[in-house]
Amino acid sequence: MKFGIVVSEWNFNITGALLNGAVNTLKKHGVKDENILVKTVPGSFELTFGANQMMENCDVDAIIAIGCVIKGDTPHFDYVCMGATQGITELNATGDIPVIYGLITTNTMEQAEDRAGGKLGNKGDECAISAIKMIDFVWSLNK
Protein backbone atom coordinates (compact mmCIF):
# COMPACT_ATOMS: atom_id res chain seq x y z
CA MET A 1 0.00 0.00 0.00
CA LYS A 2 1.22 3.47 -0.93
CA PHE A 3 -0.19 6.63 0.61
CA GLY A 4 -0.12 10.28 -0.35
CA ILE A 5 -0.81 12.93 2.25
CA VAL A 6 -1.57 16.52 1.28
CA VAL A 7 -1.43 18.80 4.31
CA SER A 8 -2.29 22.46 4.68
CA GLU A 9 0.38 24.78 6.10
CA TRP A 10 -2.31 27.05 7.53
CA ASN A 11 -2.89 26.29 11.25
CA PHE A 12 0.13 23.98 11.10
CA ASN A 13 0.12 23.59 14.87
CA ILE A 14 -3.07 21.57 14.26
CA THR A 15 -2.44 20.10 10.80
CA GLY A 16 1.07 19.05 11.82
CA ALA A 17 -0.37 17.10 14.76
CA LEU A 18 -2.96 15.51 12.46
CA LEU A 19 -0.18 14.62 10.01
CA ASN A 20 1.88 13.02 12.78
CA GLY A 21 -1.16 11.02 13.89
CA ALA A 22 -1.81 9.78 10.36
CA VAL A 23 1.83 8.86 9.67
CA ASN A 24 2.26 7.12 13.04
CA THR A 25 -0.91 5.09 12.50
CA LEU A 26 0.16 4.06 9.00
CA LYS A 27 3.53 2.94 10.39
CA LYS A 28 1.80 0.99 13.19
CA HIS A 29 -0.01 -0.87 10.42
CA GLY A 30 3.24 -1.83 8.70
CA VAL A 31 3.52 0.93 6.11
CA LYS A 32 7.15 1.84 5.43
CA ASP A 33 8.43 5.42 5.17
CA GLU A 34 9.11 5.03 1.45
CA ASN A 35 5.41 4.28 0.91
CA ILE A 36 4.25 7.54 2.50
CA LEU A 37 4.53 10.69 0.37
CA VAL A 38 3.81 13.98 2.17
CA LYS A 39 3.34 17.29 0.36
CA THR A 40 2.16 20.64 1.68
CA VAL A 41 -0.16 23.25 0.23
CA PRO A 42 -0.68 26.78 1.59
CA GLY A 43 -4.24 26.39 2.88
CA SER A 44 -7.26 24.14 3.06
CA PHE A 45 -8.77 25.56 -0.12
CA GLU A 46 -5.74 24.24 -2.02
CA LEU A 47 -6.19 20.67 -0.72
CA THR A 48 -8.29 19.72 -3.74
CA PHE A 49 -5.67 20.87 -6.22
CA GLY A 50 -2.90 19.18 -4.26
CA ALA A 51 -4.81 15.92 -4.01
CA ASN A 52 -5.71 16.04 -7.71
CA GLN A 53 -2.08 16.61 -8.72
CA MET A 54 -0.96 13.79 -6.47
CA MET A 55 -3.65 11.54 -7.96
CA GLU A 56 -2.47 12.30 -11.50
CA ASN A 57 1.29 12.34 -10.96
CA CYS A 58 2.19 10.04 -8.08
CA ASP A 59 2.08 6.29 -7.56
CA VAL A 60 -0.25 6.13 -4.55
CA ASP A 61 -3.24 3.95 -3.65
CA ALA A 62 -5.01 6.53 -1.46
CA ILE A 63 -4.63 10.18 -0.53
CA ILE A 64 -5.32 11.78 2.83
CA ALA A 65 -6.18 15.50 2.65
CA ILE A 66 -5.45 17.23 5.97
CA GLY A 67 -6.48 20.77 6.83
CA CYS A 68 -7.88 22.93 9.60
CA VAL A 69 -10.25 25.87 9.28
CA ILE A 70 -11.27 27.77 12.41
CA LYS A 71 -14.28 30.05 12.27
CA GLY A 72 -13.59 33.77 12.41
CA ASP A 73 -15.75 36.87 12.19
CA THR A 74 -16.29 36.78 8.41
CA PRO A 75 -17.97 34.34 5.99
CA HIS A 76 -14.52 33.27 4.71
CA PHE A 77 -14.79 30.15 6.91
CA ASP A 78 -17.95 29.02 5.11
CA TYR A 79 -16.48 29.52 1.64
CA VAL A 80 -13.24 27.69 2.39
CA CYS A 81 -15.00 24.79 4.10
CA MET A 82 -17.58 24.46 1.34
CA GLY A 83 -15.02 24.72 -1.45
CA ALA A 84 -12.65 22.18 0.07
CA THR A 85 -15.45 19.77 0.90
CA GLN A 86 -16.99 19.98 -2.57
CA GLY A 87 -13.59 19.59 -4.19
CA ILE A 88 -12.69 16.47 -2.23
CA THR A 89 -16.16 15.05 -2.87
CA GLU A 90 -15.69 15.63 -6.61
CA LEU A 91 -12.32 13.87 -6.59
CA ASN A 92 -13.89 10.88 -4.88
CA ALA A 93 -16.77 10.80 -7.35
CA THR A 94 -14.59 11.03 -10.45
CA GLY A 95 -11.15 9.74 -9.48
CA ASP A 96 -9.71 6.26 -9.44
CA ILE A 97 -8.31 6.33 -5.91
CA PRO A 98 -9.91 7.35 -2.62
CA VAL A 99 -9.27 10.78 -1.12
CA ILE A 100 -9.83 10.78 2.62
CA TYR A 101 -11.43 13.88 4.13
CA GLY A 102 -9.18 15.08 6.94
CA LEU A 103 -10.42 18.66 7.15
CA ILE A 104 -11.06 19.81 10.71
CA THR A 105 -13.65 22.62 10.84
CA THR A 106 -14.18 24.15 14.26
CA ASN A 107 -15.45 27.24 16.00
CA THR A 108 -12.39 27.62 18.23
CA MET A 109 -8.72 26.70 18.43
CA GLU A 110 -9.49 24.66 21.55
CA GLN A 111 -11.93 22.49 19.59
CA ALA A 112 -9.27 21.95 16.94
CA GLU A 113 -6.67 21.01 19.56
CA ASP A 114 -9.13 18.53 21.09
CA ARG A 115 -9.31 16.76 17.71
CA ALA A 116 -5.57 16.88 17.00
CA GLY A 117 -4.35 14.72 19.84
CA GLY A 118 -6.36 16.27 22.67
CA LYS A 119 -9.25 14.88 24.67
CA LEU A 120 -11.13 13.74 21.55
CA GLY A 121 -8.18 11.83 20.09
CA ASN A 122 -6.42 12.50 16.82
CA LYS A 123 -8.52 12.64 13.66
CA GLY A 124 -5.32 12.00 11.68
CA ASP A 125 -5.33 8.47 13.14
CA GLU A 126 -8.89 7.97 11.92
CA CYS A 127 -8.00 9.23 8.45
CA ALA A 128 -5.14 6.73 8.18
CA ILE A 129 -7.44 3.86 9.17
CA SER A 130 -10.02 5.04 6.62
CA ALA A 131 -7.34 5.15 3.91
CA ILE A 132 -6.25 1.58 4.68
CA LYS A 133 -9.86 0.38 4.65
CA MET A 134 -10.61 2.14 1.36
CA ILE A 135 -7.56 0.61 -0.32
CA ASP A 136 -8.71 -2.81 0.90
CA PHE A 137 -12.17 -2.03 -0.50
CA VAL A 138 -10.84 -1.05 -3.93
CA TRP A 139 -8.50 -4.04 -4.07
CA SER A 140 -11.34 -6.41 -3.11
CA LEU A 141 -13.31 -5.24 -6.14
CA ASN A 142 -10.38 -5.66 -8.51
CA LYS A 143 -9.70 -9.31 -7.68
From Swiss-Prot:
Gene3D superfamilies: Lumazine/riboflavin synthase (3.40.50.960). One of its GO terms (molecular function) is 6,7-dimethyl-8-ribityllumazine synthase activity. (2S)-2-hydroxy-3-oxobutyl phosphate binds at D73, T74, R115. The active site is at H76. Pathway: Cofactor biosynthesis; riboflavin biosynthesis; riboflavin from 2-hydroxy-3-oxobutyl phosphate and 5-amino-6-(D-ribitylamino)uracil: step 1/2. It catalyses: (2S)-2-hydroxy-3-oxobutyl phosphate + 5-amino-6-(D-ribitylamino)uracil = 6,7-dimethyl-8-(1-D-ribityl)lumazine + phosphate + 2 H2O + H(+). 5-amino-6-(D-ribitylamino)uracil binds at W10, S44, F45, E46, C68, V69, I70, Y101. GO terms for biological process: riboflavin biosynthetic process. Keywords: Riboflavin biosynthesis, Transferase. Its EC number is 2.5.1.78. GO terms for cellular component: cytoplasm; cytosol; riboflavin synthase complex. InterPro entries: LS, LS/RS, LS/RS_sf. The keyword Zinc does not apply. Belongs to the DMRL synthase family. Catalyzes the formation of 6,7-dimethyl-8-ribityllumazine by condensation of 5-amino-6-(D-ribitylamino)uracil with 3,4-dihydroxy-2-butanone 4-phosphate. This is the penultimate step in the biosynthesis of riboflavin. This is 6,7-dimethyl-8-ribityllumazine synthase.
